C-alpha cells in the first residue's frame, strides 16, 4: 500500500500475551540510529549520562520510505526520538531515563544501521547480519568480557571484537580509505551535535553536557 505501511491488531491475537500489560525491568536499553555520514560505529555502549545526551539529541537520518518526498538520506535531530510527543523540557525525560538505567543496572547501547566505509552515495549500509550479531551479543551478555575502547571524538565505548562481525567494521575510521576525509566528516557531525544541543543546555546537568562530542581535527 505504501513504502512504509503500518498495521494494528487486537492484543488477543497474541498467544503469549500477558493480561496485566506489565513486564520486568529491562537489562538492556537500545537506541537505534541511521548515520548517513558513515562515521558512527555500528554498536556503542553508553553511560547513563551519555544515554541522556543521545536521547535528548535524537540523531538519525530520514531515509526513503519513512516520509513523503524523501528520496535520499537527510540528517535530522528529533528530541527524545519523538519530539512531537514530548511537551515538557527534554531533560525531564532524559533524567528519568538515566535514573532508570542507573537504578536497574541496565546497559545502554547505540546501534547504527547506516553506512560504513564512507557516507551515503559512496558506500553501502551496514549488513543486517552484522547488526543482528551485534544486537544478539549485547543482549546475551557475550560482550561483557570483550575489550572496549573509548571513541576520542564521541566519548562512547566501542567493542574491539564481536563474533560474526569483521573487527575493522567496529571502528569506522579503519574502513575509510581516506582517513583525513573521515576526520573532517566526523568533525562535521560532532559540530552538528554541539549546535543542536545548544537549545537544551539550560536545565541539563554538567554530567550530561560533558557527554557532548568534541571536534578533533585530523588525527
Spell out what each predicted region is.
Residues 1-175, 192-195:
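Glycine-rich, often acidic-flanked micro-motifs
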Residues 169, 174-219:
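Generic C-terminus detector
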Amino acid at each position: 500500500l505504501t513504502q512504509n505501511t503500518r498495521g494494528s491488531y487486537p492484543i488477543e491475537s497474541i498467544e503469549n500475551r500477558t493480561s496485566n500489560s506489565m513486564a520486568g525491568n529491562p537489562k538492556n536499553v537500545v537506541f537505534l540510529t541511521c548515520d548517513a555520514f558513515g562515521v558512527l560505529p555500528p554498536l556503542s555502549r553508553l553511560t547513563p549520562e551519555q544515554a541522556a545526551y543521545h536521547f535528548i539529541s535524537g540523531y538519525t537520518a530520514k531515509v526513503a520510505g519513512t516520509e513523503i518526498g524523501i528520496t535520499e538520506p537527510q540528517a535530522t535531530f528529533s528530541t527524545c526520538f519523538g519530539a512531537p510527543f514530548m511537551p515538557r523540557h527534554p531533560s525531564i525525560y532524559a533524567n528519568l531515563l538515566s535514573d532508570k538505567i542507573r537504578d536497574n543496572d541496565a546497559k545502554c547501547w547505540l546501534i547504527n544501521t547506516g553506512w560504513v566505509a564512507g557516507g551515503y552515495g559512496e558506500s553501502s549500509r551496514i549488513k543486517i547480519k552484522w547488526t543482528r550479531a551485534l544486537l544478539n551479543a549485547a543482549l546475551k551478555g557475550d560482550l561483557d568480557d570483550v575489550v572496549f575502547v573509548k571513541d576520542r571524538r564521541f566519548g562512547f565505548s566501542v567493542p574491539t571484537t564481536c563474533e560474526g562481525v569483521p573487527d575493522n567494521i567496529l571502528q569506522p575510521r579503519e574502513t575509510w580509505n581516506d582517513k583525513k576525509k573521515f576526520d573532517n566528516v566526523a568533525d562535521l557531525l560532532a559540530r552538528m551535535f554541539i549546535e543542536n544541543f545548544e537549545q537544551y543546555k539550560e536545565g541539563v546537568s554538567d554530567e550530561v553536557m560533558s557527554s557532548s562530542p568534541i571536534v578533533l581535527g585530523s588525527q
